Amino acid sequence: MFIIELIKGIILGVVEGLTEFAPVSSTGHMILVDDMWLKSSEFLGSQSAFTFKIVIQLGSVFAAAWVFRERFLEILHIGKHKHVEGDNDQQRRSKPRRLNLLHVLVGMVPAGILGLLFDDFIEEHLFSVPTVMIGLFVGAIYMIIADKYSAKVKNPQTVDQISYFQAFVIGISQAVAMWPGFSRSGSTISTGVLMKLNHKAASDFTFIMAVPIMLAASGLSLLKHYQDIQIADIPFYILGFLAAFTVGLIAIKTFLHQINKIKLIPFAIYRIVLVIFIAILYFGFGIGKGI
């Protein structure tokens, strides 16, 4: 049984790594894979299972931090500054770097404030299967609207052309995505595209903005619940973290490489299919009724 439970922990880490930064809602997938299937709370205990999810989320966040490590060093003025994104080498040499620490802070403020004010309310009232399905569906529609709009935009902006106003509006959408199932990246990438950024630029800023706020949120949660960690459960935490980190690295790099080509609609369609699947399990078979 111990080996089977370790495998379950690895599976959850893989799911977290695949979905945390993709616009598909990691919350929706964790409900489907864990709460409806693997049920980590049964072999870890409810409190330890909650802490386990924080740890594997940190694995994904560290993966994003590693992918963007050079950009973070540049934003913090550590190390050598690289060229600015532009259409050609001459543009890159002539433009000063525009993305800076203030952009990131401006984007973090709305979610930070609302998180402090409503975190307990959201955790108590919105973490249910029906509310997550609503978030998945509404988020999918928003992504489709953004993609349809982006097709009309000529010369979309790069991440180094982002303004403080754009950063703030994208930050507001990150706060809206606190609704479970809506998806932080789905919301912020869509908003970035609606603000005339290209898909890659919107994705880059989404990840750069998300890393510090998620590190802070997950770190605080871990400090609150670290006493729930049992020595016997440490192998689950280690393997889950490593799985989330490794798969997260691959998923993030692949996503960033392909997003300008595939856009958001394929992810939106997937989300709608996921809603239908969860609805069948929940309403048709009663699976997850206790969540």
UniProtKB/Swiss-Prot annotation:
Q: Quote the cellular component terms of the Gene Ontology held in the record.
A: plasma membrane
Q: Which reaction does it catalyse?
A: di-trans,octa-cis-undecaprenyl diphosphate + H2O = di-trans,octa-cis-undecaprenyl phosphate + phosphate + H(+)
The chain's disulfide connectivity reads none
The enzyme class is: hydrolase
Q: Where in the cell is it found?
A: Cell membrane
**Keywords attached to this entry:** Antibiotic resistance, Cell membrane, Cell shape, Cell wall biogenesis/degradation, Hydrolase, Membrane, Peptidoglycan synthesis, Transmembrane, Transmembrane helix
Per the record, membrane topology reads: Multi-pass membrane protein
Q: Give me the segments passing through the membrane.
A: 1-21, 48-68, 102-122, 126-146, 162-182, 203-223, 231-251, 267-287
Any idea of its EC number? Answer: 3.6.1.27
User: Pfam family example for this protein?
Assistant: BacA
Q: What is its main location?
A: membrane
- GO terms (BP aspect): cell wall organization; peptidoglycan biosynthetic process; regulation of cell shape; response to antibiotic
What superkingdom does the record give? Bacteria
Q: Which GO terms describe its molecular function?
A: undecaprenyl-diphosphatase activity
HAMAP family given in the database record:
Undec_diphosphatase
- Protein family: Belongs to the UppP family.
> Other remarks?
Bacitracin is thought to be involved in the inhibition of peptidoglycan synthesis by sequestering undecaprenyl diphosphate, thereby reducing the pool of lipid carrier available.
General function of this protein: Catalyzes the dephosphorylation of undecaprenyl diphosphate (UPP). Confers resistance to bacitracin.
Q: What is this protein's name? A: Undecaprenyl-diphosphatase
Which species expresses this protein natively? Staphylococcus aureus (strain COL)
Q: Which gene encodes it?
A: uppP
